Amino acid sequence: SDVCSSDCKALAQELPVKAVVVRHKKAVVVSMLLTWLLSAGIVVVILMSPVWLQKQYGFAPAVTLQANSIATIMLCFGCLAAGLAADRFGASVTFIVGSLLLAASSWAFYHLAGSHPEQLFLLYGVVGLCVGVVGAVPYVMVRAFPPEVRFTGISFSYNVSYAIFGGLTPIAVTVLMGVSPMAPAWYVLALSVMGLVLGFWLRQAGGCRAREADTTEGSVFFTNR
């Protein structure tokens, strides 16, 4: 089409990264914040928690490994559930409900695992399932950018955000543990609140639904219905 042709010609005259940063700032910011949520869920809950359980509550390494394996398996199911929910109900509802569940389950996990060690596998499995809300992150990112800059937009937003937050999260949580041993719980709670806010923002912006087909006129989740 004429619109596609003109867009492609304009894109060819400038760097794709420049086009993404200049023309799609909102999409970049939202994608980077969602990647931060993803990194918090994976790095803190899945990767750091086994060692935290050993130091904070004195669990044996073999026990935390088993619990972590259960959480990882449940994470896979959670990601599938989040994807299905995003297709069925939209990204906004998925992040609103998923973030609330993540906040509640992570708070319970970090605070009850020590006093109820017999419930460790259940608590870790449930929070692992709820971390699966991050499975809806790619759903939003794919629809955040128009086709002509989609690959560049996703790769730029994801890689820059994960390099920053994925790298700084372990350091930040470790430093915060000097203030409170429950730093992982507070960190995940804070990011869950951010996910909740983004969910409402997506709802206000028009949401992301599968029936909104790819267009060349702009990022589809910023198009009001």
Report the location of each language-model feature:
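Short, small-residue-biased leader/transition segments that mark boundaries at the very start
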Residues: 2-5
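Hydrophobic core of transmembrane alpha-helices in multi-pass small-molecule transporters
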Residues: 118-135
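Cytoplasmic membrane-interface "Motif A"-like loop-to-helix N-cap segments
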Residues: 88-99
